[in-house]
Curated annotation (Swiss-Prot):
Alphabetically ordered keywords of this record: Cell cycle, Cell division, Cyclin, Cytoplasm, Nucleus, Phosphoprotein, Transcription, Transcription regulation, Ubl conjugation
Main location as per UniProt: nucleus
Subunit structure comment from the entry: Interacts with the cdk4 and cdk6 protein kinases to form a serine/threonine kinase holoenzyme complex. The cyclin subunit imparts substrate specificity to the complex.
Gene giving rise to this polypeptide: ccnd1
PTM entry text: Phosphorylation at Thr-282 by MAP kinases is required for ubiquitination and degradation by the DCX(AMBRA1) complex. Ubiquitinated by the DCX(AMBRA1) complex during the transition from G1 to S cell phase, leading to its degradation. The DCX(AMBRA1) complex represents the major regulator of CCND1 stability during the G1/S transition.
Disulphides: none
Top-level lineage group: Eukaryota
CDD domains, per the entry: CYCLIN_CCND1_rpt1, CYCLIN_CCND1_rpt2
Protein name: G1/S-specific cyclin-D1
Residues that bear Phosphothreonine: T282
Origin organism lineage: Eukaryota, Metazoa, Chordata, Craniata, Vertebrata
Organism: Xenopus laevis
One GO-annotated biological process of the protein: positive regulation of G1/S transition of mitotic cell cycle
């Protein structure tokens, strides 16, 4: 008798439960997000050593870890929510900021992943600057300060509600979903979006995705003005505030792309310099080549 291994790397996923994208659930989420928003003023009122640029650095590192580990899209924004909420109530030494970031990813992966990140793996990503026992101690500290309230509402929770209300094909929805998720992750790295409620970030991300994909003209339901008005009615906010959030997201995307292009050009220049050195060291005579 032959034994066949049928194990696969892909994780099985349940179909979307339509009961979870009803208006009743949406209204409950809009009420719940008010209690899970961190304070924007914690840099001035709570933290003595932590600066906005430090948050940017650790957030970028956390995003890279989540991408390399192929975490669920919700893990990174949820981890940043934990980080900001903790920093809103507890002063922290700057030397412990990476430990806090690793701990928040540890907790978020437990909430959203089928196979969560391990403490040992996260310590490796810090070049072993922290130990697993330190991470576990910090985990209890974070849980205590967050009062064990880990079911935070994030922008990802709203995206499916918005797409469900839009007359689109499934393929188009999937493209918008991926673009909006990218915008949400980008917003989580920027300190200027801390004060924005998750519903507004999600609506602004969806609107920016539709605009970037050129899905509508001036007369269609997906025109900038009509879509902004529609989404603002769904989340019960001022259309001008939502439009400002969308423009802020688009501006952040442009600056991020510009920065990435500059880094790419700098790395290309460095590579060209190395190549020139290699060329100058190449023997001009075949007899000089050491096989």
């Amino acid at each position: 008798m032959e034994l066949l291994c049928c194990e696969v790397d892909t994780i099985g996923r349940a179909h979307l439960d339509r009961n979870l994208i009803t208006d009743r659930v949406l209204q409950t989420m809009l009420k719940a997000e008010e209690t899970s928003c961190p304070s924007m003023s914690y840099f001035k009122c709570v933290q003595k050593e932590i600066l906005p640029n430090m948050r940017k650095i650790v957030a970028t590192w956390m995003l890279e870890v989540c991408e390399e580990q192929k975490c669920e899209e919700e893990v990174f924004p949820l981890a940043m929510n934990y980080l900001d909420r903790f920093l809103s109530v507890e002063p922290l030494r700057k030397s412990w900021l990476q430990l806090l970031g690793a701990t928040c990813m540890f907790l978020a992966s437990k909430m959203k992943e089928t196979i969560p990140l391990t403490a040992e793996k996260l310590c490796i990503y810090t070049d072993n600057s922290i130990r697993p026992d330190e991470l576990l101690i910090m985990e209890l500290r974070v849980l205590n300060k967050l009062k064990w309230d880990l079911a935070s509402v994030t922008p990802h929770d709203f995206i499916e509600h918005f797409l469900n209300k839009m007359p689109l094909t499934e393929d188009t929805k999937q493209i918008i979903r991926k673009h909006a998720q990218t915008f949400v992750a980008l917003c989580a790295t920027d300190v200027n979006f801390i004060s924005n409620p998750p519903s507004m970030i999600a609506a602004g991300s969806v609107a920016a995705a539709v605009q970037g994909l050129n899905l509508g003209n001036a007369d269609s339901v997906f025109s900038t003005q009509r879509l902004t008005l529609f989404l603002s009615q769904v989340i019960k906010c001022d259309p001008d505030c939502l439009r400002a959030c969308q423009e802020q997201i688009e501006s952040l995307l442009e600056s991020s792309l510009r920065q990435a292009q500059q880094q790419h050009n700098a790395s290309s220049d460095t590579k060209n310099m190395v190549d020139e050195v290699d060329i100058s060291c190449t023997p001009t005579d075949v007899r000089d080549v050491n096989i």
